[in-house]
């Protein structure tokens, strides 16, 4: 035998509480099952009760099946019966006792049959529960029926058939209307109703497969509906009416309902506030979310239907917690908005409060240990990259003697200091805003010519060697035989091309030499065999080492007598460059630029090294080139010598280089021939630039002129901001001290040169002459001729000068210079320019004063002469004592007085000087406190010029 089902467990399965126990017991009575609070059921009884409560399917339990009342068969077929319990589920809000009293007994109905129709006791707003389904729509809502309704319609048909036999008993007050015709009409109407009910039954079967229920619809049983049921019982006692009369009554009822609904619309009732409304007045919780309630299933206070949600089947247990969080956030937001903005002010302590908050923010920051920053970075950008507080960075620099603002740029030294102070690992990257060249990934890299840079000390024969390679004379065109500009040439050897870059060798052009090393593949260091390694030679080796390029040594001037190549090799070996014949890895090729010996061997060595390196580049795509030199040429405007690194540069291509932009108009090779395109490692002179680009800048080919112009403008804005930021680099203490002592003397200069590379070299050389007392202030520099605007810039200064290199002023400029009293000096050799500016600075500097000791005398006796003063009788112990010379009076090793010897006598005669071992009389100017034992020390002041 199966186990019994406890009623409490049954409630738990239904998702109901103990408060709903009475309703479940009453529903059990509807199917003939008597239950109590602690009762148990068989599984069969529990299943039927579950179907009745959940699905509305009523199956009577045979043991408790109630008997049918025969008196109810006499009721009218179009009215609703009152005595049998309705087949729809009902749950009364009144207690059980009150409900049982309101139900009439069959006996009382039988006794009052011939009297006035007995009314059922008035109920207090019962409710009717109807299942709702997920796919119900607005049209399907009123069609919800159950199997019990179909049984009810069949009972009506049986009652109508029985009413024919009891026709005479029901026609006491209105016999004319109780004829068989009306009964026949009623029968037809009942058949129609049965057919409609069958359609509804099919609709129910369609919904039987839907297991999920969204809730119960509770239909309010108000007084009007109770009156309708009572009236239906009373009317069941009356004789049957005609169909026209019935329709007339229905029409009146609907009109009354419409009037009542109109009154309710004018005076809408306010629903009572739920407990959650106290905590959440502005937030509406939508219980119907994700529950597929459609049509009239949503609760409307104006209707007589209420929807009870079935929440126990949904997995929304955390719904309430989410709603509480939302409600709390809304309350917090409202609380912040209502906050008084002055409630936390504390008078003069407001600033300290902000400082405390500032320190708290700083404590929350996590300092990064390894960062990557661009080469040129501002102070605030460095703080952001390193996740540091800006105030701490500025404070650290201030403690180190640097007065900076957040927009100032940091140099490499400052970055290294900050990295050490904050324990950071910093990698500096050159991330200036440049256009990335679109490389064709599927393109094939092709072999390209090697780029060779000729480097070395001044006058060691670099240009002459390259001239011999090209079989042309170039060095004689350079002033003083010194290369002033970078020269780039293409040389063919064994059907292979080699690109040569000739860099100036003297110290002033170290920047240009460094720039040449950045674009080269192989460095050839030229060293004169009769001169050996010099300072510029060491610098050239350092540049090549920094560029990580292989080095080949060319020992030039081997045609001279008494040369010692082994000595040169030994000097290079001391620097770490061991020759191959000494067991090292560096080639030392003996050459002669005068006779041409060894040049073929040098070229073959270069080509072998290039084959080992396997130099390749992609020829497709936009060009990327390096500007070796820029200048202004008459009739052509701004021109630039470029060497292509990747891609192809053609005539008509748009480009930009730093602040310059334009479109390639013409291209000329080193022999003066016009060409249409440049491939990797090729060199040419291009025209069509908006201005002279700085030497060493990267030229990028772009799609059109608008992109080129935009990128150049961005770069110009960046450089302008960087130049303005340099004004705050001097500390206030240093500046105020120099101004107070009038020690700082400036020489404003305007520098004009024919090429950009020469201009940079001159500027760097002049800035190296600056010191603490005098300084050269470059107020303007540019490429091109001297203009009247240049004169106006320096006209207001006393020592202003305009320096021109390889340019000459016009007649109008010379006349204006005389009016403004401005000196214009032009040069063709950079050495002459630097030496003359050095002399000018030395003239403004105060000379160095040195003392020369001349003699010494000891005081043996003193003589006081009235109206004259004290005369000291002395013996010259060292040197010569002269009249009018400066002397110090020393007593016990301490200088008592410093002055001039006013009178010098030998006995009674005045003398000019007294030699060692002789006696003399000495009188000082305006000083008489001389004692026996004092010492006179005489000296001369010698003024010497400063050196730079």
Curated annotation (Swiss-Prot):
Region (G2): 481-485
Positions with biased composition (Basic residues): 208-219
GO molecular function: GTP binding; GTPase activity; translation initiation factor activity
Source organism: Helicobacter pylori (strain Shi470)
Protein name according to UniProt: Translation initiation factor IF-2
PROSITE patterns: G_TR_2 (PS51722), IF2 (PS01176)
Binding site for GTP: 456-463, 502-506, 556-559
Compositional bias per record (Basic and acidic residues), positions renumbered to this chain: 68-78, 190-207
Main location: cytoplasm
Region described as G1: 456-463
Compositionally biased intervals (Low complexity): 173-189
Region (G3): 502-505
Region listing for Disordered, in residue ranges: 61-120, 162-243, 255-285
Entry's family note: Belongs to the TRAFAC class translation factor GTPase superfamily. Classic translation factor GTPase family. IF-2 subfamily.
């Amino acid at each position: 035998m199966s186990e019994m089902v406890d009623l409490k467990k049954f409630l738990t399965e239904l998702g109901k509480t103990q408060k709903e126990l009475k309703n479940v017991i009453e529903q059990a009575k509807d199917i003939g099952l008597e239950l109590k609070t602690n009762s148990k059921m068989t599984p069969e009884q529990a299943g039927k009760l579950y179907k009745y409560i959940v699905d509305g399917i009523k199956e009577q339990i045979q043991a408790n099946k109630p008997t049918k009342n025969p008196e109810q068969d006499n009721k009218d077929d179009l009215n609703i019966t009152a005595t049998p319990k309705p087949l729809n589920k009902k749950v009364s809000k009144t207690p059980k006792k009150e409900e049982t009293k309101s139900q009439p007994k069959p006996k009382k109905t039988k006794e009052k049959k011939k009297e006035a129709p007995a009314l059922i006791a008035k109920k207090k707003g019962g409710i009717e529960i109807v299942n709702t389904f997920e796919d119900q729509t607005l049209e399907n809502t009123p069609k919800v029926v159950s199997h019990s309704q179909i049984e009810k319609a069949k009972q009506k048909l049986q009652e109508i058939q029985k009413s024919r036999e009891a026709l005479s008993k029901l026609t006491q007050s209105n016999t004319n209307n109780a004829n068989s015709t009306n009964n026949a009409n009623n029968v037809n109407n009942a058949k129609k109703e049965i057919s409609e009910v069958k359609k509804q039954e099919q609709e129910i079967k369609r919904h039987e497969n839907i297991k999920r229920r969204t809730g119960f619809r509770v239909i309010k049983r108000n007084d009007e509906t109770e009156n309708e049921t009572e009236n239906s019982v009373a009317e069941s006692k009356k004789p049957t009416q005609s169909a026209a009369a019935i329709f007339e009554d229905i029409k009146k009822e609907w009109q009354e309902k419409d009037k009542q609904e109109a009154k309710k619309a004018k005076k809408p009732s306010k629903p009572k506030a739920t407990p959650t409304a106290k905590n959440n007045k502005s937030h509406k919780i939508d219980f119907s979310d994700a529950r597929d309630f459609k049509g009239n299933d949503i609760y409307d206070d104006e209707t007589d239907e209420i929807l009870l949600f079935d929440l126990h089947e949904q997995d929304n247990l955390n719904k309430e917690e989410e709603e509480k969080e939302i409600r709390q956030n809304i309350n917090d937001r409202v609380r912040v908005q209502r906050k008084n903005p002055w409630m936390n002010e504390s008078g003069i302590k407001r600033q300290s409060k902000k400082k405390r908050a500032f320190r708290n923010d700083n404590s929350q920051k996590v300092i990064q240990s390894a960062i990557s920053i661009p080469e040129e970075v501002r102070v605030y950008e460095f703080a952001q990259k390193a996740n540091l507080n800006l105030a701490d960075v500025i404070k650290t620099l201030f403690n180190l003697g640097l007065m900076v603002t957040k927009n100032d740029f940091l140099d490499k030294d400052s970055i290294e200091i900050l990295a050490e102070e904050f324990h950071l690992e910093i990698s500096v990257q050159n991330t200036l805003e440049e256009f990335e060249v679109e490389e064709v990934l599927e393109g094939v890299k092709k072999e390209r010519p090697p780029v060779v840079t000729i480097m070395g000390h001044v006058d060691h024969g670099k240009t002459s060697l390259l001239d011999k390679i090209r079989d042309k004379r170039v060095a004689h065109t350079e002033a003083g035989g010194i290369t002033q500009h970078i020269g780039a040439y293409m040389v063919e050897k064994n059907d292979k091309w080699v690109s040569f870059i000739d860099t100036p060798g003297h110290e002033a052009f170290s920047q240009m030499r460094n720039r040449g090393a950045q674009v080269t593949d192989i460095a050839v260091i030229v060293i004169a065999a009769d001169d050996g390694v010099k300072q510029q030679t060491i610098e050239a080796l350092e540049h090549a080492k920094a560029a990580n390029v292989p080095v080949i040594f060319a020992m030039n001037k081997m045609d001279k007598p008494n040369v010692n190549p082994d000595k040169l090799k030994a000097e290079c070996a001391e620097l770490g460059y061991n020759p191959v014949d000494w067991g090292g890895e560096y080639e030392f090729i003996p050459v002669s630029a005068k006779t041409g010996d060894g040049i073929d061997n040098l070229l073959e060595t270069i080509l072998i090294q290039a084959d080992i390196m396997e130099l390749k580049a992609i020829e497709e795509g936009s060009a990327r080139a390096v500007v070796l030199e820029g200048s202004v040429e008459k009739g052509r405007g701004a021109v630039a010598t470029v060497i292509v690194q990747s891609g192809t540069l053609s005539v008509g291509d748009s480009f930009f280089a730093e602040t310059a932009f334009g479109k390639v108009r013409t291209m000329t090779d080193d022999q003066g021939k016009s060409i249409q395109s440049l491939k990797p490692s090729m060199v040419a002179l291009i025209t069509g630039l908006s201005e002279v680009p700085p030497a060493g800048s990267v030229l990028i080919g772009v799609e059109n002129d608008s992109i080129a112009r935009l990128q150049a403008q961005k770069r110009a804005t960046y450089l302008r901001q960087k130049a303005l930021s340099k004004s705050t680099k001097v500390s206030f203490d240093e500046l105020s001290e120099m101004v107070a002592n009038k020690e700082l003397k400036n020489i404003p200069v305007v520098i004009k040169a024919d090429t950009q590379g020469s201009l940079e070299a001159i500027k760097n050389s002049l800035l190296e002459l600056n010191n603490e007392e005098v300084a050269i202030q470059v107020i303007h520099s540019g490429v091109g001729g001297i203009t009247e605007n240049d004169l106006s810039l320096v006209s207001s200064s006393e020592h202003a000068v305009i320096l021109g290199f390889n340019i000459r002023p016009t007649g109008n400029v010379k006349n204006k210079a005389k009016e403004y009293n401005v000196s214009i000096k032009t040069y063709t050799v950079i050495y002459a320019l630097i030496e003359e500016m050095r002399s000018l600075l030395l003239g403004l500097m105060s000379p160095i004063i040195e003392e020369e000791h001349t003699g010494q005398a000891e005081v043996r006796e003193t003589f006081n002469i009235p109206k004259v003063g004290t005369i000291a009788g002395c013996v010259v112990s060292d040197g010569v004592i002269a009249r009018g010379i400066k002397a110090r009076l020393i007593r016990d090793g301490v200088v008592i007085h410093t002055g001039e010897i006013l009178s010098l006598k030998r006995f009674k005669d005045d003398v000019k000087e007294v030699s060692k071992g002789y006696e003399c009389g000495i009188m000082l100017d305006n000083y008489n406190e001389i004692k026996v034992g004092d010492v006179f020390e005489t000296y001369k002041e010698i003024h010497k010029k400063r050196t730079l």
